[in-house]
């Protein structure tokens, strides 16, 4: 008990991962993880600031929020920090015109972006779109550029759907890095800029915030690198070996979001 009180003291803001923490995606909209709907509601009734922080790149924010609302979650589009809008801002600021290797579900986020005569490649979780033809075209675009720029929406290895584990964008990103001899710019977790933008949105300093996620590297490690605390839930992509990871150790491990919220609210003012 004393250990938890020390780990959670002074927390004013909570960043929540979505996939694997709130719900598992999949056919029919996926399924809420037991206890997570009420856990989010309890957090939002508390004095704690809450921000949803996701690497979701198969759905637009609007579509993702719609799925979650239908599952019963209290969430709005403006409460979500996601990589596609952040990427669009970067593209505009730097005058980049992307060749897109992304899922059709997120393409609407790029409607205002100039894609003529591409001078970079943007890759996301394209799902079935990761064909040889599409990967090779992205490779060709990069190789034709004097200074190739590859932007990746996250770099996750895999995630969990209701039907099982699914390959994420990271493996495909690494293939293009290797083939082209370049290093991708990652927008999304574990990028420090991504976490900082989420914290800025709720007006909380890193040392006052805690991340709750299922990814030991992207969620936990990334948050800790920014000076935040982080809890790992034993849902979603969690594997038992995560608790013995050679490089990253969470500030605590909990069975699910409901347990994390119980602990946070119990020790909120201690």
UniProtKB/Swiss-Prot annotation:
It is found in: Cytoplasm; Nucleus. GO terms for cellular component: cytoplasm; cytosol; nucleus. Its EC number is 3.1.3.-, 3.6.1.1. One of its GO terms (biological process) is phosphate-containing compound metabolic process. Its cofactor is Mg(2+). It catalyses: diphosphate + H2O = 2 phosphate + H(+). It comes from the Eukaryota. The keyword Ribosomal protein does not apply. The keyword Cytoplasm applies. Binds 1 Mg(2+) ion per subunit. GO terms for molecular function: inorganic diphosphate phosphatase activity; metal ion binding; phosphatase activity; protein homodimerization activity. Pfam families: Hydrolase_6, Hydrolase_like. Phosphatase that hydrolyzes imidodiphosphate, 3-phosphohistidine and 6-phospholysine. Has broad substrate specificity and can also hydrolyze inorganic diphosphate, but with lower efficiency. Belongs to the HAD-like hydrolase superfamily. This is Phospholysine phosphohistidine inorganic pyrophosphate phosphatase. It comes from Rattus norvegicus.
